[in-house]
């Protein structure tokens, strides 16, 4: 009847001549670390195999996608267990076996189950619409790391910082800006970027959500009419011919800097401003944070820059303000992101 690759869930319709036995779904939100669970499956073709263990962790992020929040269990599961139920001791399904972590391919006591609440939400949409519609804000976001929080003068490293806006998207229309830190949605605290993505996804397209935003130290409330998330498509980067390395006209924090030429702006689709990183000292904090030659500094703090001197001035201003690190908005080949770099590095 429908599939949802983002969560690895499919809804099947079975034709049967008689009523089939069913199981009852439970409330996975009530489980705790240490609770006993039972996993059922067909490991290596051995049907109706049952194993037992405990909940090792909840809300586990293993890079399986923005919409999955796995239950980690230590009940032995192997290849063939995927799709089988995970029961609590009341006999209710609290999850569906999904994958294992194993260097050898066999069970090492680290398995993951998709929570029953996720299954319920996805199946309801597959049954009614044949697809899963997710709310869309139209932003590229990052989690607020301790370094980013320090550079912004924030007390807590919670929330999601807006690195880029989709032109014409819901957030852009509502007045969001690069550098805004989203701290809550509809009154509920946002822990990190993944939390925000999941929460926005649950808002129906056309509904309005209210976002608490920290903009340059000031709190704002922004109301956004949520859009329907478009199909995920990977935008291919058009290869550009290699250009001669520009002369270094400035240095800061282990970075060689040069002003962008109009041709370079055109190649990278940058409307105005920007300072090219021409080299990175491999022993610098900038290198540790993943900055590379060819990246482009768009902002230092909240100020757009177009010359190496403006980058240096922004760093000096942050240092004068007592900050140990400075926040850079950097355009890379993969998109825009914020990077907090130690000033002393």
Regions found by a protein language model. Name each.
Residues 1, 14-46, 78, 124, ...:
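Active-site substrate-binding loop(s) of clan PA
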Residues 22-24, 70-72, 76, 161, ...:
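Conserved beta-strand positions that form and line the central face of beta-propeller blades
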Residues 13-16, 32, 93, 118-345:
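C-terminal recognition in membrane/secretory proteostasis and scaffolding
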Residues 6-9, 60-68, 187-188:
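Short, positively charged
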Residues 5-8, 79, 334-335:
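Short acidic/glycine-enriched loop/turn segments that link adjacent beta-strands
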């Amino acid at each position: 009847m429908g599939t949802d690759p983002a969560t690895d869930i499919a809804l099947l319709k079975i034709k049967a001549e008689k009523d089939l036995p069913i199981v009852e779904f439970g409330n996975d939100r009530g489980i705790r670390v240490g609770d006993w669970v039972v996993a059922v499956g067909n490991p290596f073709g051995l049907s109706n195999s049952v194993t037992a263990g405990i909940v090792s962790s909840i809300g586990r992020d293993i890079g399986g996608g923005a919409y999955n929040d796995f239950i980690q269990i230590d009940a032995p599961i192997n290849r063939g267990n995927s799709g089988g139920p995970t029961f609590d001791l009341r006999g209710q399904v609290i999850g569906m076996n999904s994958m294992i972590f194993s260097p050898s391919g066999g069970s090492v006591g680290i398995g993951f189950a998709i929570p029953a609440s996720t299954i319920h939400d996805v199946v309801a949409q597959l049954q009614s619409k044949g697809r899963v519609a997710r709310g869309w804000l139209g932003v590229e976001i990052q989690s607020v790391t301790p370094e980013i929080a320090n550079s912004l003068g924030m007390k807590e490293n919670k929330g999601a910082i807006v690195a880029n806006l989709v032109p014409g998207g819901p957030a852009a229309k509502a007045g969001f800006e690069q550098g805004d830190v989203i701290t809550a949605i509809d009154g509920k605290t946002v822990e990190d970027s993944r939390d925000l993505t999941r929460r926005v996804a649950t808002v129906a397209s056309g509904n309005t959500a209210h976002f608490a935003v920290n903009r340059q130290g000031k709190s704002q409330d922004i109301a956004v009419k949520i859009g329907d998330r478009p199909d995920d498509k990977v935008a291919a980067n058009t290869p550009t011919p290699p250009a001669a390395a520009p002369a270094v006209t400035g240095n800061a924090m282990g970075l060689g800097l040069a002003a962008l030429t109009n041709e370079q702006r055109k190649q990278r689709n940058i409307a105005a401003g920007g300072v090219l990183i021409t080299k990175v000292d491999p022993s610098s904090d900038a290198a540790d944070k993943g900055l590379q030659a060819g990246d482009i500094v768009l902002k230092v703090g909240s100020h757009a820059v177009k010359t190496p001197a403006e980058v240096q001035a922004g760093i000096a201003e942050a240092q004068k303000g007592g900050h140990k690190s400075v926040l850079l908005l950097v355009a890379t080949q993969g998109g825009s992101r914020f990077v907090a770099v130690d000033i002393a590095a």
